[in-house]
Amino acid sequence: MEIKIHRGLDQIGGCITEICTDSSRVFIDFGQNQPSNGKAATPEEDTLMVADIIRNNEKEHQAVFYTHAHEDHVGLFRYILLEQYIGEGSKELLLIKYRTLLERYEMAIDENHQLQEGSKENEELQEENYRTTKDLIDKLKAFKTWKRTALKESPSPITIGDIRVTPFFTCHSIYDAHMFLVEADGKRIWHTGDYRQHGYMGKALFPMLRRYATNIDVLITEGTMLKRKDKCIHECEVSRKMESVMQAFKYVFVLASATDIERLASIKVAAETANKPLCILSLFMKRTMEFFTERQSSLSRGLFSFAPLFYTDKLYRKLKRRGFAMVVGTSQTDRIKELLDKLPQEETLLIYSSWDGYYKNAEQVKANSKYKEFREMFHNVVDIHTSGHADKATIRKVIETVCPKEVICIHKEAGASL
């Protein structure tokens, strides 16, 4: 068995790991590079890079496995012709995302046709976006999946030639993340993907490792937080901090990810405790919340059950009187601006609940200035966030628990070490 880290030893995100035998090979993640990893590649450059990696060292049996649905882990799927595997929940999240985008492009095309005076160039761009997104949906539909294993049940391995890959559910800042046990040639590799212990679902991390991550030859672990001094508070503490500031302001906006089930739960609990109606105005967030509720409500004793108000202008007067907690994303900037113009700024707060690098890091801002611009719309802003990644103490404990013969650290900044 051989391991090759194509990308990830000295960068966060964009990871590509290859594990092979004489007759078979699997890739774990084919992630899109993040802005902090240098100049963004063009689609043509990504196509060539993926083709070169796959063409070199081809085997009779081959497949790609994805740990979760963040773009820096799954973003290059569009260029891959091999069989691709992902968790059932992750596949559904990606389909929700691209189907919602497809509807948006469809509406834009219809509006252009109705106006009959829109620019030809813009119309062609929207039609190209529509075709591309439709192709991505078709490609995603072909993904093979595994179902998350019920508590107290052992997950089933997936066989690719003489390699066995077994997925294990883990806690991360997106729904349906997994670790992998890869077995072949009498060797056992444990690939962690992205993980943490300080989320609601993180308590299962070490019981799982003690039970399944035994006799491991090589541990491949993420190291995102190795050079960072951020304190990783628990999601419960995130919720308590949010509840406290929600008590102090009448109108509260919370900038958070629509795919982070645990953060959405923290916001929901904070809003309930502060006696504020939970609102959203994103169709994508509405659909992810419905999906989470359908899949996880009963399993979580209601923690992951969501029933937000979908904001419309008809609700404005009622919410103006009562106040609200509204979960938002940067794609809703224009609608938020309209609403902010109607609200007293001294009673309005933004809880920024995302990584602060999106507005502090110059490379990130250059690549996507929306987070910084979104913050600047508000007079009152407070950061309440915790990482989706394991802190140094958790990484150390994982290594001590697994006790592998060798450790490879990926998904880490250049110069970071164990």
Regions found by a protein language model. Give the residues of each.
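Positively charged, amphipathic N-terminal segments that serve as targeting/anchoring signals
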Residues: 280-317
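His/Asp/Glu-rich metal-coordinating catalytic cores
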Residues: 1-65, 70-262, 266-273, 277-281, ...
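Short Asp/Glu-rich motifs
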Residues: 96, 264, 290, 393, ...
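C-terminal regulatory/interaction regions
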Residues: 11, 269, 273-275, 304-418
